[in-house]
Amino acid sequence: MAPPPPAPPSVTLRTVLLLLRVLTAAFLLITVVLISTNTVTLEISSTSIKLPFNDVYAYRYMLSAAVIGLVYAVVQLFLTISQFATGKTHPLTYQFDFYGDKVISYLLATGSAAGFGVSKDLKDTYIALIEFDSTDPVDKFFSKGYASASLLLFAFVSLAVLSVFSSLALSKRPVPVS
């Protein structure tokens, strides 16, 4: 006789998972808005040079990671709400959660690292070339880069916690009887 299937996650655990999914999506949405609106106009020798975020490759990568993560987070949010409402979980959901959480969390981590790295390097280079203070618009440009990278890092941490839960859920999933 086959062992009884494990009990579905408790309502409290489902609520925590739902809140983590919402938190991840919120962090990613704010990241996308911040980085996509990041632009600065440099005044060098009476010449104006507009520097939008997409002129910096690492910021483009960061935006791409955030958008991909946001799409995944929204899909997962709908799946989690569906599971929460019905109390039923499709057998393939365990694997989708497991692999998706792992891949997307690493994508978010690398996007965050790229954002931190390029913000520091470009700011240090700019400081070496031109003296500026905290009221300079260039400082605001780099501050938005740091803020976006920080939010992407928070989204990674949130998704990494979800990844632990999806690993546990996969190992305890009900095995279909043939």
From Swiss-Prot:
A single Gene Ontology CC annotation of this entry is: plasma membrane
Annotated coiled-coil segments of the chain: none
* Compartment(s) of residence: Cell membrane
Classification via InterPro entries: CASP_dom
Q: In which tissues is it expressed?
A: Expressed in the root epidermis.
| Residue spans crossing the bilayer | 15-35, 61-81, 98-118, 150-170
Q: Kindly state which keywords UniProt assigns to this record, in alphabetical order.
A: Acetylation, Cell membrane, Membrane, Transmembrane, Transmembrane helix
Residue ranges annotated as Cytoplasmic topological domain: 2-14, 82-97, 171-178
- N-acetylalanine is carried by which residues? A2
Which domain of life, per UniProt? Eukaryota
The principal localisation class reads membrane
Extracellular-facing ranges: 36-60, 119-149
Matching Pfam families, A to Z? CASP_dom (PF04535)
Topology relative to the lipid bilayer, per the entry, is: Multi-pass membrane protein
PANTHER family in the record, alphabetically? CASP-LIKE PROTEIN 4A4 (PTHR33573), CASP-LIKE PROTEIN 4D1 (PTHR33573:SF44)
Q: Which family does it belong to?
A: Belongs to the Casparian strip membrane proteins (CASP) family.
Q: How does it assemble?
A: Homodimer and heterodimers.
What is the protein named?
CASP-like protein 4D1
Q: Which organism is it from?
A: Arabidopsis thaliana (Mouse-ear cress)
